[in-house]
Regions:
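C-terminal binding/interaction regions
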Residues: 92-131
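Conserved mixed alpha/beta catalytic, RNA-binding, or beta-rich assembly cores of soluble enzyme
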Residues: 1-91
Length: 131
């Protein structure tokens, strides 16, 4: 757990991660989706059938700049078949959409190409943290 890439979070971003975490856990429990996009305490996008990348794009359009993305696992998720994942494409789309922070669930989210994800997040001035 902790900061994986990018700058230290501001108090506002930390608050958005906390709110987004609670909301993401609830939508995951309801089997709606696993990702929330939030800015300044307001949820701007909820992942559903369209998937994470489309939720990021929609959230970025609505938030314009400085959004926070939170991705969690479902309760009792079968980690053999359905692991939450972020990778290069996630970071690229998030950066293009104005997301500045990505929070993921520690030990339950797979970072594909971890070193490349960290490098791209750092190059994009994007914080990535696990909790």
């Amino acid at each position: 757990p902790g900061l994986i890439a990018g700058p230290k979070l501001s108090p506002r971003q930390e608050h958005d991660v906390e709110l987004g975490w609670n909301a993401a856990k609830e939508i995951a429990r309801l089997d709606i989706g696993q990702t929330i996009i939030i800015k300044n305490g307001t949820i701007v996008a909820v992942e559903a059938l369209e998937g994470t990348n489309e939720a990021i794009k929609r959230g970025g359009t609505l938030a314009r700049e400085g959004a926070v993305m939170v991705k969690v696992s479902k309760p009792n998720q079968d980690m053999r078949f359905d692991v939450p994942v972020i990778g290069i494409e996630t970071i690229r789309i998030a950066a293009e959409s104005g997301v500045r922070v990505i929070g993921v669930e520690a030990e339950k989210t797979l970072l594909l190409e971890r070193d490349a994800v960290i490098a791209l997040a750092n190059d994009s001035n994007m914080s990535v943290l696990a909790r």
